[in-house]
Amino acid sequence: MNLDSLTAYRLVKKEKLNDIRSTGYLFRHIKTGARVMAIENDDENKVFNIAFRTPPKNSTGVAHILEHSVLCGSKDFPLKDPFVELVKGSLNTFLNAMTYPDKTCYPVASCNDQDFQNLMHVYLDAVFYPNIYKKEEIFRQEGWNYHLENTEGPLTYNGVVYNEMKGAFSSPDDVLERDIMNSLFPDVTYGCESGGDPENIPDLSYEEFLDFHRTYYHPSNSFIYLYGNMDMTEKLDFIDKKYLSAFDSLHVDSEIQEQKPFDKMHDLVMEYPVAESESEENNSYLAYSVVTGNAMNSLECTAFDVLDYALLGAPGAPLKKALLDAEIGSDVYGSYEDGIRQTYFDVIAKGADPSRKEEFVSIIRRVLTEIVQNGIDPKALEAGINCMEFRYREADFSSYPKGLIYGLDILDNWLYDDEHPFAQVQLIPVFDKLKELKNQRYFEGLIQKYLLDNTHGSILTLNPSRGLTARRAKALEEKLAAHLASLNDEEKAEMVQKTVELERYQETPEDPETAKCIPMLKREDIRKEITPFTNEALDIDGSLFLYHEVPTNGIGYLDLMFDVKDLPAEKVPYLGLLKSVLGYVDTAHYTYGELTNEINAETGGIMCGVEVFDHAESIDEFRAFFSVRGKTMYPKTDVLFKMIREILNTSSLEDTRRLHEIISQVKSRAQSSLVSAGHSTAVLRAASYTSPMAAFQDAMAGIAYYQFIETLDREFEERKETLVAELTELMRELLRPEYLCISYTGEKESLSDVRKQVKALRQTLHQEAVEISEQSITCEKKNEAFTTSGQVQYVAQTGNFRKKGFAYSGALNILKVALSYDYLWTNIRVKGGAYGCMSGFKRSGESFFVSYRDPHLKRTLDVFKGIPEYVRNFNADEREMTKYIIGTISGKDVPRTPKMQGAISKNAWFCGVTEEMAQKERDEILNADSTSMQALAPLIEAVLLNNAICVVGSEPAVNKEKELFDNVLPLING
């Protein structure tokens, strides 16, 4: 970097960042005081982020609504939705915006330099010169609005953020998290809901919304971040000349204030909604929470991550075990929040009896006191430190750019501390220090200081309340009816007119000439060839050994896969349970707690799961495997295999009390995930009506599996002997050498050792004769709705075009982008107010359309019905078509971590996708035009013809449209 030419900036700090092989620079913009960080390295996946401190003073969600709104057009890019245009037409590897409790971030990433420049330009223009001052409709669309179609009513609220937060406030886990933070920080910004409380969002006025932007969206309050291999001097010069230099320095009062400590712990009782089908008995949350210092102390923050693991995170961890043994809750877990100025630590019991609150607190304090007196298990500390350090060094964030995660982590310090801005990417010395301190009672001292002797905390009881959603809905309905009744005829007419004007604004198509202001790449900028797969098929005594030679920085990624093709249908749910049991029960040489610590102290972890692959060319054909995945540094390969053998060959299933604990935890977590990922739940269930693979997955991980687990938990005493027999038999039937395939990703130097270990492992697997009664999975179309206590819907419709005689085409990838960011986006998100909408098309023909946190139900299904007409009339000029093609390719050309390279190649192998097929798909994408898109209309009609629908949603919305369904059932029972 040519520092001499950067006359607009003052260099504050330059440091070698050895942990991430980079050089870090910290600047201050001289004219405005903007904070600027540049991290130089050879990473081609370049990242830009601009963040602002945005502490809310209430729970109207102004920071969140503003985050949505500034991306709805700006001075240089006066479109209605430049964000969507970028998604459709850039090679971005990340493009989004996020609201946190005290900051708002606008990050982008791309490997293409021109594309990166374009993204940075649009985002800078959006935050500094948004169209929100010219178009009140933006605020009304993204935040909230009165919706009144005629003067007689009814009057309702709508808005993207309003509906998003209605969904968020429907999740008890989210409600608990908010209530805990509010209980610990009642007098500062963390006592407010930055995302917005649906009850308070309509209190926000347009002028208050604009004032928030005027106050906080100024360079003097900004934190600008650049990362990767780029001309930093050029980028910083652009940022100065185009934006920062136009502003003067301004004192922005955005400092995050600290909550004064409490004299004694606060004791609070709150409530959350449950459906009528759900029990109020033993369904409370108990939370013991304490403030644990501040985010600027990297040593303490990292130490608390380790303590979270050692006390609560690991199976068999002492605090977790004590609470489970006392049957305080069906699930016990902890969390450590260090993404805000004042950090805090929680101990949470879910599925608890509120009358046992005192006992809950007493056990926590007794166990912690004993731990302080007797010392923490050294192996647990070693495992916790190694676990955190392995993850930090590996830096595998899947499809998310490394620089993005580094930048967001850096803000955890930088936002509050200009002195140590790079602390989050300089943690190796911290891990080394913790290894020194683990035998010096440092961790015990933290427990005593923060968890026992600390009065700045809260004890929160969150109780279930049947009918709470209905009472709130009735109160809102009455409030809006009263408001409508208070208006005179002129005011009502004006409200109807504003509704019409907003709809007109939303329905007005983007001017093609205006759209050209968004800079765009050319088709020639796109690589023509696919990234080759890395599959080398080897053989070990008859077992397929799929080797992926990839530079992995000394880490080996192992996947032992046992084919379950002959598994009878009635055993599939037990397969789903087995993945949660193995590795979490006692073995011949370890208790389950010792087993976890041994694995995490010596390796990067071992995890069991089930992998499913649908065949690319054969309809309804799929392969499924019970998998044991592990990762380790090459020198510890023998330890990894030793621990895998311990799990597969010596796991004890006789401890039925432990099995019941696991089942209760699986049930508890499924209750949360089925609702929070309601779109995935609904899609899988709808697909299971006609797809054997989806029916298999539903029985092993979806609604059918939850129903199996719920029954097993309720009738455990009667079923426990059968359960032990079924799991034991399943292991004998599955864990056999003839069913074993291996996928391994690593460098050549590690291969011979892994092959030797696999060869030895095969000899230890079950080889006795077994009889398996094969029974294929049957599908049954049901068209179901599953009711929840929530206030929004997840509406899914599925089908299979291959079964109707249509072939797969690469153009379907483009259609997915066009639907998600044009037709569905406009009709379901913009006009309908849903938070999200998605579609998908697989080579097997399986296809879906789904909405996310949607206030509607039947209206959304009607939107789906209109898709064929949209496709039939699809008419994009060359520029628009190129945009869609670029946006489609960006989703396929995401930079791959070493682990991803192996996984993608493995998936292609088992799905029967060759490089020739992948290249054909890419060619079809690159050569697509409007005609090839229009040709997909009959295919989409065939998908919708199946009329397979599933909805996860609120009781009132479902009951209003119950004639659409064959079955209406509660999602959660008991």
Can you describe what each PLM-predicted range is?
Residues 211, 223, 232-251, 374, ...:
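Extended, regular secondary-structure scaffolds
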Residues 40-42, 49-51, 162, 166-170, ...:
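His/Glu-based metal-binding/catalytic segments typifying zinc-dependent metallopeptidases
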